[in-house]
């Protein structure tokens, strides 16, 4: 039976977030709802989750020794990674010492780079994926492209939000694609994956929860990507019953193989009744922010329930809903938001993340909407997002 202590008291139940962005902020809020003590960690100060945490720390999370010292200092009951750029070998070591890592250290280690999870899915589980090759030198990269053929996609094995990704259609693009991939990796230059282009009708995120009362699924989430980053997401994504069943089967296999309790964002390509595995994150997914308005429990609430060992019960989906990102482009350490009166009309909500600064394009918030159908919800969310004017000095 779970016992939760009182935050800021000797019997507190402590949760340490490794990564304190907008997703971590919502996880922190859900932890606060249950009286958990929240320690937010990131590589920069004043990150969004730090605004709603009891304490915060700024460290290089790729530094295993620094991470180990902080865990020894704070003694968390749960370590909850929000990002991939973490010293996952240290998480494995800490777990072996009795520390609870969410969902488990193996899941964070395998999914921190595309090689580990692709080998698990394609070779161990024998799931359908795109054709692929790995390369750690420029010559090996060129050979991989020749084997895969054009068009193909190159990605650093360790990157997120589209960083370092390129679509290659012909040989003259190879040098620029290789150079960009080397700049975009989370740990600097290194190995890349070259993937054959998959012809699909649409992409989905299937939020899959592994909990004490079994495997649960949210309704499929559709999304639109631009420059490797999501711009809008919607729920539910219409798809055939056969495709839904296949998607659940694939997601269940992946989640069970990774292990542990928590919510997983399983990314899949859908073409008719055919479903192809793409990627998985062992944590809430950015496209899943639509669940802040579309469900009785958001993906963040589900994640917290699951990793605490609590039953999930019933997930209710309220109908057509959408999210659209607020993505301004400017440079400022003193950001201001205007136009909320125009944005907040009808069935809309706004989330502003509270990021401390911006240099270029940065996702600073999200607009949420519900409507009679997903197309209408998307348009309402996009209008609301565009109504928010961001300025800075």
UniProtKB/Swiss-Prot annotation:
N(1)-(5-phospho-beta-D-ribosyl)glycinamide binds at residues 22-23, 82, 286, 355, 362-363. GO terms for molecular function: ATP binding; magnesium ion binding; phosphoribosylglycinamide formyltransferase 2 activity; phosphoribosylglycinamide formyltransferase activity. The keyword ATP-binding applies. GO terms for cellular component: cytosol. It comes from the Bacteria. Signal peptide: none annotated. Involved in the de novo purine biosynthesis. Catalyzes the transfer of formate to 5-phospho-ribosyl-glycinamide (GAR), producing 5-phospho-ribosyl-N-formylglycinamide (FGAR). Formate is provided by PurU via hydrolysis of 10-formyl-tetrahydrofolate. Homodimer. Belongs to the PurK/PurT family. This is Formate-dependent phosphoribosylglycinamide formyltransferase. It comes from Yersinia enterocolitica serotype O:8 / biotype 1B (strain NCTC 13174 / 8081). The gene is purT.
């Amino acid at each position: 039976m779970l016992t939760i202590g009182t935050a800021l008291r000797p019997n507190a139940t402590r949760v340490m977030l490794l990564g304190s962005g907008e997703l971590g902020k919502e996880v922190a809020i859900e932890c606060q709802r249950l009286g958990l003590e929240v320690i937010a960690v990131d590589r920069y100060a004043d990150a969004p989750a730090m605004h709603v945490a009891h304490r915060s720390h700024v460290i290089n999370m790729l530094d295993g020794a620094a991470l180990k010292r902080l865990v020894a200092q704070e003694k968390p009951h749960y370590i909850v990674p929000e990002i991939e750029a973490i010293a996952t070998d240290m998480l494995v070591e800490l777990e072996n010492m009795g520390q609870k890592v969410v969902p488990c250290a193996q899941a964070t280690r395998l999914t921190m780079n595309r090689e580990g999870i692709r080998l698990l899915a394609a070779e161990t589980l024998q799931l359908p994926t795109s054709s692929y090759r790995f390369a750690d030198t420029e010559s090996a990269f060129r050979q991989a492209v020749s084997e895969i053929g054009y068009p193909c996609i190159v990605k650093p094995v360790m990157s997120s939000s589209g960083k370092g990704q390129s679509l290659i259609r012909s040989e003259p693009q190879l040098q620029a694609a290789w150079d960009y991939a080397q700049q975009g990796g989370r740990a600097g230059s290194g190995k890349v994956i070259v993937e054959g282009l998959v012809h699909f009708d649409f992409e989905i995120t299937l939020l899959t929860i592994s909990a004490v009362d079994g495997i649960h699924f949210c309704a499929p989430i559709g999304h639109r990507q631009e420059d490797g980053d999501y711009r809008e997401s919607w729920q539910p994504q219409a798809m055939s019953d056969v495709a839904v069943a296949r998607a659940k089967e694939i997601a269940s296999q992946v989640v069970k193989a990774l292990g542990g309790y928590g919510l997983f964002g399983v990314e899949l390509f859908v073409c008719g009744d055919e479903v192809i595995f793409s990627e998985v994150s062992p944590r809430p997914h950015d496209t899943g922010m639509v669940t802040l308005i579309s469900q009785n429990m958001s993906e963040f609430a589900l994640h917290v329930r699951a990793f605490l060992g609590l039953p999930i019960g019933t997930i209710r989906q309220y109908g057509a809903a959408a999210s659209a990102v607020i993505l301004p482009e400017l440079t400022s350490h003193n950001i201001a938001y205007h136009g909320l009166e125009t944005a907040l009309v009808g069935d809309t909500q706004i989330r502003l993340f509270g990021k401390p600064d911006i240099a270029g394009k940065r996702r600073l918030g999200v607009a949420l909407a519900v409507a009679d159908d997903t197309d209408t919800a998307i348009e309402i969310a996009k209008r609301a997002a565009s109504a928010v004017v961001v300025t800075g000095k």
